[in-house]
């Protein structure tokens, strides 16, 4: 895009650039006038670069006019003194001016000599290109590249979240995540639930104080469970699911993680996702609570009687029973196994 502008440096400007590269100047201000790069002002060193910086740079920045500033550091590389290239494009400047200066940046760097430019700083407000702003820029350059909010959320979820439905033969994993402490009231409520003194416990994260606290212990029937799910904030729920299955009366503890989509802040979603696995580890190991099922929902309306029953007692796929093996000869079969690994075959007697 820089070639489309046709803007070049005049011979006078090139001569000043040459003297500047040799250390004569501390600062050059360059503008675009009549389709040429021109020197607006220049200054010689007065003190060390950091003491000169703000007093030299900031007074030259106009509120509605873009410009370029080349500021010389005291350090040198193989080609000579090192420079900071500042591209100033204030918010209130004309759009055409912004585009013109953006398109000519590469031309200016080529004319001056890119090997002399140590850092490039872009600013729309003075704080961006002040000495403090430059130091913040250096700090950001030494840190990992920043992610977008969505990328950061996804990264945290992938790093911190460990599968909670693991088989009995799964090797032990070090659980990663944010292990916020659990308040005394919340822990006591979970103990009561485990002892069947409560049938519902709702927990929330106190984000400001970084602790998991008790939110609700209202006696809850299955038909009332959807009403307990907030529509504008995340929660953890432990529910004592009383039901019958194949003629047996069962009381099963179900963990429900409710996250109402994107009505919550990114920070809230990240924290609830990260704290979930450490919370379950504490509950299952320290309280010896048998959590029969872990469910994630974004809407309380999902918690119907049929949904919960099928989550706790998943239906067997019909095709698994479609091709039954024929029975072997009488007297040749061993004791029938109820659970068989994939590699196992029917045991036979001697």
Curated annotation (Swiss-Prot):
The modification Phosphotyrosine is found at residue 309. GO terms for cellular component: actin filament; myofibril. SUPFAM superfamilies: Actin depolymerizing proteins. Phosphorylated on serine and threonine residues. InterPro entries: ADF-H, ADF-H/Gelsolin-like_dom_sf, Twinfilin. The modification N-acetylserine is found at residue 2. Residues 2-139, 175-313 form the ADF-H domain. It comes from the Eukaryota. It is found in: Cytoplasm; Cytoplasm, Cytoskeleton. Residues 316-350 are annotated as: Disordered. The keyword NADP does not apply. The modification Phosphoserine is found at residues 143, 277. Keywords: Acetylation, Actin-binding, Cytoplasm, Cytoskeleton, Phosphoprotein, Repeat. GO terms for molecular function: actin binding; actin filament binding; actin monomer binding. The modification Phosphothreonine is found at residue 349. The keyword RNA-binding does not apply. GO terms for biological process: actin filament depolymerization; barbed-end actin filament capping; positive regulation of neuron projection development; regulation of lamellipodium assembly. Belongs to the actin-binding proteins ADF family. Twinfilin subfamily. Actin-binding protein involved in motile and morphological processes. Inhibits actin polymerization, likely by sequestering G-actin. By capping the barbed ends of filaments, it also regulates motility. Seems to play an important role in clathrin-mediated endocytosis and distribution of endocytic organelles. This is Twinfilin-1. It comes from Pongo abelii. The gene is TWF1.
């Amino acid at each position: 895009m820089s070639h489309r502008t046709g803007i070049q440096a005049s011979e006078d400007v090139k001569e000043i650039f040459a003297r500047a590269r040799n250390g004569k100047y501390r600062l050059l201000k360059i503008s675009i006038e009549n389709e040429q790069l021109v020197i607006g002002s220049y200054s010689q060193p007065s003190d060390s670069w950091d003491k000169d910086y703000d007093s030299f740079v900031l007074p030259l920045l106009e509120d509605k006019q873009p410009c370029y500033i080349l500021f010389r550091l005291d350090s040198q590389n193989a080609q000579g003194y090192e420079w900071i290239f500042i591209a100033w494009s204030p918010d209130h400047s004309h759009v055409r001016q912004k585009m013109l200066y953006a398109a000519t940046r590469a031309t200016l760097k080529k004319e001056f000599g890119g090997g002399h430019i140590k850092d490039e700083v872009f600013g729309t407000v003075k704080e961006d290109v002040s000495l403090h702003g430059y130091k913040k820029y250096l700090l950001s350059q030494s840190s990992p590249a920043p992610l977008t909010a969505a990328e950061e959320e996804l990264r945290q979820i992938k790093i911190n979240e460990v599968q909670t439905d693991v088989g009995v033969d799964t090797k032990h994993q070090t659980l990663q995540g944010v292990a916020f402490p659990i308040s005394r009231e919340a822990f006591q409520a979970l103990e009561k639930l485990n002892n069947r003194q409560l049938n519902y416990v709702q927990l929330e994260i106190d984000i400001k104080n970084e602790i998991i606290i008790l939110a609700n212990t209202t006696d809850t029937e299955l038909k009332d469970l959807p009403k307990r799910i907030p529509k504008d904030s995340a929660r953890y729920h432990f529910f004592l699911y009383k039901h019958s299955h194949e003629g047996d009366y069962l009381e099963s503890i179900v963990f429900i993680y409710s996250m109402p989509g994107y009505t919550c802040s990114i920070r809230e979603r990240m924290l609830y996702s990260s704290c979930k696995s450490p919370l379950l580890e504490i509950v299952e190991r320290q309280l010896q609570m048998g959590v029969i099922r872990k469910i994630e929902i974004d809407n309380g309306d999902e918690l119907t009687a049929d949904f919960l029953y099928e989550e706790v007692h998943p239906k067997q796929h019909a095709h698994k029973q479609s091709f039954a093996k024929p029975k072997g000869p009488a007297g040749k079969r061993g004791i029938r196994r109820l659970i068989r690994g994939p590699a196992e075959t029917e045991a036979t007697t001697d």
